[in-house]
Amino acid sequence: MVNVIGLGYIGLPTALMMASHGVEVIGTDYNKELVATLNAGKTTFKEDGLDELFDAAVKAGIKFSTEYQRTDMYIVSVPTPYDKFSKKVDACYVVAAVKEVMKVCRKGAIVVIESTVSPGTIDRFVRPAIEEVGFVIGEDINLVHAPERTTPGNMVYELIHNNRTIGADDRVIGERVKEYYTSFCQGEIVVTSIRSAEMTKVVENTFRAVNIAFANELARICRHDNMDVYEIIKICNMHPRVNILQPGPGVGGHCI
């Protein structure tokens, strides 16, 4: 049985996807009203295909609770807010969730961190939190990082079709987790180290941010010099190795 911790924009679709594809799932969230809404048969946000996925998961037996479950696999999908003053990701919710897992988990349980974190976050914050209570990583508990790669508005489709990265200390554990994601993911799933998985997510987002910034900077220059940026981009994109984005409002979304 998989206990998905955090039933927000990533955790809920992930839980529903696994449940509707044959995995026994219990979703956990501290928000009592959210859990009550889900148990009443209603979704908590709108997303293309989510209602149909929810119905399929309910028929398959998914359950929702405010309690952490005693099991051997957890998926942590809680917020990692950005501190605008320190310009760092706050991992406190991830650490708190892992600490709660350790109170109930079976020996050898797998804890998958899906939350977006910066490179080194698991080493700096999650591992010490586990070791502080006397758990031995690799024996009492196994750590895995499987960063999500979805975008709001197309989440259900991308959960199925996007490629995935799974980072693990032990490749055997990584392959075991891969089997769960393979239940619904039709994309390629690559198993690597935890730090590499952390880095790939940040690099992917940075690549997008840089390209968005480039298009917007180009628009600013063209506006200053009274040139048509859209015509220039169209001509430049005729080159087989050039693909400039269209100018827009800038970067956005939780991950970027």
Predicted regions: what they are:
Residues 1-256:
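Structural/interface elements that position substrates and couple domains in central-metabolism enzymes
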